[in-house]
């Protein structure tokens, strides 16, 4: 069994300091460099193998990357940030927020790890630089570099398949999909996982995918535009239901449908993803798959703590399932 005395001897700090750190003494005042060095030695000597019941309280950073031009999408990530801040306060952790990755890179020595929130693109070269100076990181909802960092994400493929199965159970076989394009990574436009899953799963079920409309950013404005495009092409041949990739898009689509006197859920039904606050107040209120943000934050912090004390383990990507919150846009009779 590795002892505190051995860690103190190799790290060059007193046994009292080491003991207070490893036992989460709230009154201990030491620099981040000191904390990092002690934890590094504890990891190297295998201290945690004999003390698996202990849970350290690291000093962490929040890397927050959002596009403030899109209010509803911004609200989703703002809510994630608020959940993280509240949880950090509850658990008596220390956290500082960074809005620019270069600032975090410059200050990396002050932290044991970071949580990433937001969907704004980051250059791969910057992520590599960050990993060199702060390798312990967990991204929430997205992961721009799964080969470098951990992530906790909603299980979107499961959600899409669940939606299709639910429609089919309720006798709906003409199903459309409205979505935006995926994120850019090093200037390369990726396809969105929701649209990929929709097309592939529909084909495995032998169902028509002609009502698939994927274009542009995830925004209310683009949702409105896509709603108009769908109606211009298919108003006399609407599917029985649409799955829409996010509430942000769904609000715009619903506005376009209302303007063209398309009655939801009579003429076509709608299922959406995210279950943001606004979907309760549109007309009709949207049935939407809920993403449990608090659970994602709790899992992210647990994963980060585990990574800090097990830095040599492989990176992990955890997918969390969603649950449907039923409102008036689609009320399933069979679940």
From Swiss-Prot:
Regions recorded as binding DNA: 4-23
UniProt-listed Gene3D superfamilies: 3.40.50.2300, lambda repressor-like DNA-binding domains
Induction details: By glucose.
Keywords of this entry: DNA-binding, Repressor, Transcription, Transcription regulation
InterPro entries referenced in this protein's UniProt entry, alphabetically: HTH_LacI, LacI/GalR-like_sensor, Lambda_DNA-bd_dom_sf, Peripla_BP_I
Domain HTH lacI-type: start-end pairs: 1-58
GO molecular function annotation: DNA-binding transcription factor activity; transcription cis-regulatory region binding
Record bears the keyword Transport: no
SMART domains assigned to the protein according to its UniProt record, in alphabetical order: HTH_LACI (SM00354)
Stored Pfam families: LacI, Peripla_BP_3
GO biological process entries: lactose catabolic process
Pathway: Carbohydrate metabolism; lactose degradation [regulation]
PANTHER family reported for this sequence: HTH-TYPE TRANSCRIPTIONAL REGULATOR EBGR, LACI-RELATED TRANSCRIPTIONAL REPRESSOR
Annotated function: Negatively regulates the transcription of the lactose utilization genes lacL and lacM.
The protein, known as: HTH-type transcriptional regulator LacR
Native organism: Lactobacillus helveticus
Lineage: Bacteria, Bacillati, Bacillota, Bacilli, Lactobacillales
